[in-house]
Amino acid sequence: TSLQTVSYSDTTWALLFNSTESSVFASQELRQALAGIARENAAVPSSGLFTAASGLVPDGLTVDGITYRDTAGDPLPAIADPRALYLNARQGMASSDFSGVTLLLPKDSGLNELAEQINGAWQKDCSLFFSIEQVPQEEFDQRIASGSYTIALAPIRAEGGSVYQMLQQFGSAESGLTGWSDPIYLQRLDESTRQTGR
């Protein structure tokens, strides 16, 4: 008999939309609509290895001894009617704008069932037909780093338990995970980092 070893880390799996200016997902409304539909329809995978996330930053992480989740609350956006938001976001877009869109995930991540649920919800609610692409972890990491994806189901890690390291993965078009850029977000994160010395 052998036991399987499962390593746990401070990780949240999230949908990443490549939101560079040339991407169909440059529209914040479209990203929010698809994320809202996914959230409404996704169930925790049945493998028992995952739990539902209450926010991007996992429970239990601290900043200067203060639990981040207790202080920040639940920052998940409340999208009242993602279908209406989707219809509004689609104004002026053609179906051909979505050709070649794939949902990328690492092979052997245990999340194929979840990816199929999300993709099925987008098909049902939005008539969007994306393919699911599973690739080896090394290729997945390279494609995320280079921005060579349209949508990805990806692990967002707090290496060493650092909330700041986790949050710094967003907000910069050059070094961020999604191509999204917000100077105010980066300024606030920098101010907070300097105040805590992290």
What is each PLM-predicted segment?
Residues 2-11, 181:
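A structural signal for short loop-to-beta-strand junctions that line the ligand-binding cleft
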Residues 2-6, 146-148, 162-176:
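Ligand-binding "clamshell"
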Residues 7, 19-21, 37-49, 61, ...:
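Sec/Tat-exported extracytoplasmic proteins
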Residues 11-59, 99-109, 197-198:
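Alpha-helical secondary-structure segments
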Residues 15, 28, 32-36, 84-87, ...:
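Solvent-exposed, polar/charged alpha-helical surfaces in well-ordered, non-transmembrane soluble domains
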Residues 44, 128-140, 165-198:
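Extracytoplasmic/peripheral linker and loop segments enriched in polar/acidic and small residues
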Residues 48-92, 109-113:
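Structural transition elements
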Residues 88-158:
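Ligand/substrate-recognition segments at binding pockets and active sites
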